[in-house]
Amino acid sequence: MLETGVLVIGGGNAGCAAAIASARHGARTTLVERYGFLGGTATAAMVGPWMTFHSGGDRIVGGIAQEIVERLMAKGASPGHVADSSDYVATITPFDPEVHKAVLFEMMREAGVELLLHGYFLSTETVGDGVTGATFATVAGSRRYQATVAIDATADALVAHSAGVPTQQGDERGRVQPASLMFRLSHVDMHELARYVREHPDQMRTSLAPGQRKAAALTAVAGLNEIWQAAVRDNIVDVPRELVSIFASPYADEVIVNMTRVVNINPLDPDDLTRAEVEARLQTMQLLDFFRTRVPGFANSRIAATGTQIGIRESRRIVGRYTLTADDVLNARQFDDAVARSAYPIDVHNPSGSGTTTKRLAPGKSYEIPYRCMVPVNREQLLVAGRCISTTHEALASVRLTPTVMTLGQAAGTAAALAVRSGSMVGEVDPAQLRATLEADGVDLRRT
């Protein structure tokens, strides 16, 4: 058995931020990831751009998340935060997933995080109410770790579920949001697309005047309704989407396509997950044909990359010491133990068909997420970070976005390191001390 101070299971964006924060605060930290790279949905599923670091004109996400963006910018792999030309959020943050993988490895080395890649979680070890370690499958057999604190950053609450933490899934009928496989198209003539949306001003959701719709300004295009509906009628596509949804990448002739949709799935059922992967890749080929034959500027486009796996919006959520609700989100609620802020709307993609329901905060407002959402109701020395924290189905539709989960990860790693240093339980970490430490590390917890 190997020993560590803080054991982070899952090397996605939440897990990476947790491991970096923990190690920077002096805890011996081990991160175990199932793939041969880090980044989770941002790299394995290529989910991007990141949405959103801002509420109106104010940046509300900082810390490690902002540091990652600045490192990507320094490598020419992100333009930083740019205005969302589709008016869905204030800003979006395009990035290159391949460079993001390398940036995360650099940050792990600098912080002194011990890595185990290609490690597949099998089970937890508990003593009384405490989680004391975990076992993983590796190419050389099983490997056990004993830890003072464990952080579940698996996105599916695998560790918490194994440890007997109560969980919930989906809406009141158990339905979860659909899954989507992201892909990138290169060799795109953005000037031709811009010309089309200038000449057809009602075919794009935007506040940009037609004359402002230049290629460089089109960071996101949502619409092209007439083109899409005609393709559906002509049986070019059979995808349960209501509009075209594409985003600019860091590179001038490339776009990110977020349009595949596999409905009626349970992402924790391996057969459903298999079906979703197959259906999404077949949808991708339909969409490639659609773009080449119907959308101006895409005649010579090629698939530059697809996600290693399909993107999952929702699976398990733990029951924590507090459950964040839709009312908390929409009313911009504040908490004494808040560790993160977000202004992303509640957007629920229809679990069984096309359409998306969106509920927004008041302009310029943001809500807070309390530390208690990461602390299981019945276990000690275990924290949960990422989309599987304690929320309702609707609240999760806002919380799940990458900038937010990176901040939650930083909070979890910081709290774990504080607990190791003081010899306390994670549920006993002083919220005021945690908040002060996070703010000193660049996390924006200001109140407006």
Where are the regions that the model predicts?
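N-terminal Rossmann-fold NAD(P) dinucleotide-binding loop
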Residues: 15
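Conserved N-terminal/central alpha/beta ligand/cofactor-binding core
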Residues: 21, 27-28, 33-123, 127, ...
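Conserved beta-strand-loop-beta-strand element in the redox core of flavoprotein oxidoreductases
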Residues: 125-144
